[in-house]
Amino acid sequence: LQAMEDDLRSILARDPNHAATLNALGYSLTNRTQRYEEAAELIERALALSPGDPAIMDSLGWVYYKLGQYVQSESLLREAHDAFPDPEVAAHLGEVLWAQGREIEAKDVWQDGLRRVNDHPIILEAIDRLGVALP
């Protein structure tokens, strides 16, 4: 992680407004550390530079979920999923719905993601970690 973080920060030192790099660093921090506030700041900057980018909205929705901000998270993830119904976005949206007790909706989102990409590892990891059985 440290080498990757150093590389991304080196890019940002040369181009502090590189939205894809801001997003990559923020998303990596979200998934590999508990530095969620820092990750959110990076991804928020990325989204300000590239509004409407579904990948960045997914990242920001995911870090908001990690911060317990479920309403904001769900809103961003739904918008990202509508624009780009990628299975990874589906995995994140499903997990946010599950955390809010909306289990049927979560299962529907995960099943849709698995229809798009059978055996998608991120969806399978989420449902396994949460102990979910899909029909």
Regions found by a protein language model. Name each.
Residues 14-15, 49, 82-84, 116:
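Structural marker of alpha-solenoid helical repeat scaffolds
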Residues 18, 53, 86-87, 120:
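Residue-level recognition of tetratricopeptide repeat
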Residues 21, 56, 89-90, 123:
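TPR alpha-solenoid repeat register
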Residues 26, 80:
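Bacterial c-di-GMP phosphodiesterase catalytic domain signature
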Residues 27-29, 63, 96-97:
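Hydrophobic face of amphipathic alpha-helices that form TPR/SEL1-like repeat modules
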